[in-house]
Regions:
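Non-catalytic pre-domain segments flanking phosphatase-related domains
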Residues: 1-39
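Hydrophobic "anchor" residues
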Residues: 44-45
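Low-complexity intrinsically disordered segments
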Residues: 104-106
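Short, Lys/Arg-enriched alpha-helical recognition elements, typified by the DNA-recognition helix
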Residues: 86-94, 113, 131-142
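Substrate-recognition element of Asp-dependent hydrolases with the DxDx(T/V) motif
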Residues: 37, 132-148, 153-168
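Short coil-to-beta-strand
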Residues: 35-40, 124-129
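Conserved phosphoryl-transfer catalytic core
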Residues: 50-101
Length: 168
């Protein structure tokens, strides 16, 4: 897998969403001394179709796993079917190992999660085949957590870029 092929399912499987209204009133004021803008992604630049980040998703996504395996073309290569329990177990295991005082909630390396789940399911992926795990992660995430740009995010990013404001 070269380039950004993993992005294709993320774009192809999405559909327009609108953000949920809140009771918070906007408070806009001039900040002339801004030297850079740092964004939180979910809920700021991107709408998430699965709800709040970190919310406990207890839905059974077996059908989404099967669709993703089929889309990547490895559904017939696995002696054992991956399960949500396997995915959650790997996420918990990786997070427990990476958790520290200075990082109480480590970011999940979803490609590593899928590599481990596939290994548990009987498919070992060496470094030369990591693209399979990348493709599978993209296929599954596009189905389980669809996203859509937050209204106005393109305009905000464009205005900041045109003003040469550093962003992160």
């Amino acid at each position: 897998m070269n380039g950004h092929e993993w992005l294709s399912p993320v774009l192809r499987l999405r559909s327009e969403m609108q953000p949920l209204r809140t009771d918070v009133e906007a408070s806009v004021r001039s900040l002339p001394e801004i030297r850079a803008v740092i964004f939180d992604v979910y809920g700021t630049l991107v709408i998430s179709g699965s709800g709040d980040v970190g919310s406990a998703d207890t839905r059974d996504h077996s059908d989404l796993i099967e669709q993703s395996l089929e889309a990547v073309g490895i559904d017939d290569l696995l002696p054992k079917r991956p399960t949500m329990e396997m995915i959650h177990s790997q996420i918990e295991s990786i997070n427990a190992r990476r958790r520290a005082d200075d990082c109480p909630k480590p970011e999940v390396d979803i490609v590593e999660v899928w590599r481990r789940v596939l290994r548990q399911s009987g498919l070992e992926l060496g470094a030369e085949r990591v693209g399979i795990a990348v493709a599978l992660a993209a296929q599954y995430e596009a189905r389980a957590n669809p996203t859509w740009p937050m209204p106005g995010s393109f305009e905000v990013l464009t205005a900041l870029a045109n003003a040469e404001t550093p962003m992160g």
